[in-house]
Amino acid sequence: MLPEGVEELVLWQDEDKEREEAKSSLPAVKVDNMLTRWLRPHQREGVSFLYECVMGLRGFEGAGCILADDMGLGKTLQAIALMWTLLNTSIEEDQKPTVKKVVIVCPTSLVANWDAECIKWLKGKVKTTPICGDSRADAESAVKMFLAPQSRSQVLIVSYETFRIYHERFTTESSCQLVICDEAHRLKNGETLTNQALAKMACKRRIMLSGTPMQNHLDEFYSMVSFCNPGILGTTKEFAKKYERPILAGREPYATDAELAKANERNEMLSVIVNKFILRRTNTILSKHLPPKVIEIVCCKTTPLQRSIYEHLLSEKARIAQKTGKQMDVLACITALKKLCNHPKLIFDAIREKKYAGKTDGGNAIDDNLTPYFHGLYDGGGSGRGGRAGGQMCEGGEWHGGKFAVLARLLHQL
């Protein structure tokens, strides 16, 4: 039962004249009312867009799409609404569900969140398998169970790093009929092992979710589009010749009128193709529903635990660089320090994930020598449903990070 004023969301209707005359038209494809009741207008539009793309109804070669809405516009809910619809409806005469198996690939820190969102919106009606244990044996067992012919599990939720380990299990059409990649800007480099592993999937229905605006790097744009709809922009060389070089030439300060005209022409040609399967909305569409945004910057002191780990990271990297003579991976160090400044558990999770994936870093990433700092703090779980790769937060863990401590005090006042 829908609230007053909310209409059903119909994604497809049978327009076959012969079946209509024979009064044997196929049932319309509708989004379940338990989800429709919560969808805002822009989300209804988004679900329709996703459905038309993966079902080949938008007039382009492929079955993938990119939903690039700003953060806060409900990309997760839109994806779940589509997923549930495909698991339960069909446009074929046999009326067998369009998809039987779904794989959701996301950063490690979002595995538990995706599982919780599926449970929240679908009220436990879908059987999910979140891979968030801290041992390879657990992951091996979960993947095997998900792929078993008699398995009741419909949705596998897995981190990018873990999927890369088991990607060869998903090269058949029966293993997965829909893949959803969250934080999909991670696939902007087509040369990475993660991108290559995902590209080997037999599944052609590929949804990419990213709240990060696409930059002006055409090679990165090409990589994302090519994963989404392989071959739609040609080979790398063909894309460079037809689009990249002319467009970049037109951006040069001293570009001629002819180069500018050609750049605009190729830009328009490219837009005509990609706008069929890329949808981006900004959060300005919510402005009429929300009060004006007020931003206040609060400076938070680090905790003793954060300071100790911070000093360790700096001294350890300097020591390794001096000992080996190798240049430090500055970006990796900065990333680790940024994580630490948010909360020490992010460092703990990174150590666990690296160990679990069997990585060795050569001193350029977060090292195992940090483990003693976390003794007894976050290892209370992590293998259960809804846990995370690095264990669960201990009681009082919010006081281990300066930002979290300030947030905890604010919430207490509220």
What positions do the PLM features span?
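Charged, low-complexity alpha-helical linker segments
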Residues: 1-2, 34
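ASCE P-loop NTPase motor core, strongest for the SF2 helicase catalytic module
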Residues: 12-251, 271-296, 301-308, 312-414
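Structured recognition/catalytic domains enriched at protein termini
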Residues: 2-8
